A protein has these predicted regions:
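Outer-membrane beta-barrel biogenesis signature
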Residues: 20-65, 135-142
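Surface-exposed strand-loop-strand hairpins of Gram-negative outer-membrane beta-barrel proteins
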Residues: 25-31, 59-84, 113, 164-165
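Residues on the lipid-exposed face of transmembrane beta-strands in outer-membrane beta-barrel proteins
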Residues: 43, 54, 86-92, 125-131, ...
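Transmembrane beta-barrel strands of outer-membrane/channel proteins
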Residues: 56-60, 100-104, 145-151, 194-202, ...
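Outer membrane beta-barrel transmembrane domains
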Residues: 65-74, 218-330
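Residues that define the transmembrane beta-barrel architecture of outer-membrane proteins
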Residues: 80-84, 116-125, 141, 168-174, ...
């Protein structure tokens, strides 16, 4: 029902006729509307050839509990996962943009040892191919295919007494997404920019040793198989003035679950021995929103501040994440 509702809402937003708008003299021009972009849903537009986008994000994932297998909230110790990610993109041609997205992080846990220092997370390579271009007065949105390859550069196992040092997944993850973006003129003549994205990601098997981000302990030897992830994103940005924009994301994600297989080292007996170990996380889902406000100094430089909140879910963490970013296009 949730997926159906999101898809229906996004379809209405993308293909709603441009009726009931203000008189042409009051109609905001596209050049007058400056955007930073919402927090979660990435854009469908590609950069003009030869141009560069730099957009660093900083955030604090505050986790105070989780949603159990029945979707009920269960509280736990508070964990702060401070992090940053930076989009570094380049317009190779007008319809093809490529780049890299590095991440860094630090975990401040409620009990136990914090991260030993700021660490490198996984790095993502991105290629974006534009399929169509929005034209004012038309019904076709800007759309693009986005291919991402995440490289396991972050530490994820052999964490010793500091599980909080785990900032990566250890897996090569491939994601394919379809992004779309459309513009609507509201009755007062102001522009509402909408986005609807759908993505699917799959990861390879990961060799795991000792304490890891997968919950294994010292002495473990085996593999983890992260589950596939399906995601839906929808976003709305309302141009209050050419500088100020109100933004809202709504998103849904479903994970098919992680399987762990291997052996644990048991040392309680006279002779240490290895015993089989297996665990399955089970499938999970989460639904969240991310309200935000943007301020744009020019059409090429702007900032956004907002909060991402996981409002519901099953077998997943319950977190709220303050986020800030600056968007710069050269």
């Amino acid at each position: 029902m949730l997926k159906y509702s999101l898809s229906t809402l996004a379809t209405l937003i993308v293909f709603l006729p441009l009726s009931g708008t203000a008189a042409e003299t009051d109609r905001q021009s596209l050049d007058d509307a400056w955007w930073t972009g919402p927090i979660v849903a990435a854009g469908a537009a590609t950069l003009p050839a030869g141009h560069t986008l730099i957009e660093p994000y900083v955030y604090d994932v505050i986790t105070r509990g989780r949603y159990d297998g029945d979707g009920n909230y269960r509280s736990s110790d508070t964990v702060h996962s401070y992090g940053s990610l930076t989009y570094m993109l380049y317009g190779v041609t007008d319809s093809f943009t490529a780049g890299v997205i590095p991440t860094f992080g630090f975990n401040d846990v409620g009990s136990g040892a914090d991260s030993s220092g700021i660490g490198v997370g996984d790095v993502t390579l991105q290629a974006q191919f534009r399929l169509s271009q929005f034209r004012e007065g038309g019904r076709v949105p800007t759309s693009s295919l986005v291919l991402q390859q995440t490289l396991p550069t972050g530490k994820y196992d052999q964490l010793g007494t500091r599980p909080s040092d785990g900032l990566g997944a250890g897996a090569y993850t491939t994601s394919l997404a379809l992004h779309s973006q459309y513009y609507l003129w509201m009755p007062n003549g102001r522009i509402l920019r909408t986005r609807f994205n759908v993505a699917y990601a799959l990861s390879d098997s990961v060799a795991v040793a000792d304490t890891s981000v997968y919950g294994t302990r010292e002495g473990f030897r085996g593999h983890a198989e992260p589950g596939d992830t399906f995601s839906l994103y929808s976003a709305w940005e309302y141009s209050v003035t050419n500088n100020w924009v109100l933004a809202l994301d709504a998103f849904y994600q479903h994970d098919s679950g992680t399987h762990i297989r291997g052996t644990d080292l048991v040392t309680g007996n006279a002779e240490p021995e290895r015993v089989p170990f297996r665990a399955d996380s089970g499938s999970s889902w989460r639904f969240g929103i991310a309200p935000a406000i943007e301020y744009n100094w020019t059409s090429r430089v702007g900032v956004i501040v907002g909060v991402r909140w996981f409002a519901a879910g099953r077998n997943t963490g319950a977190s709220i994440t303050p986020v800030a970013a600056i968007n710069m296009v050269y």
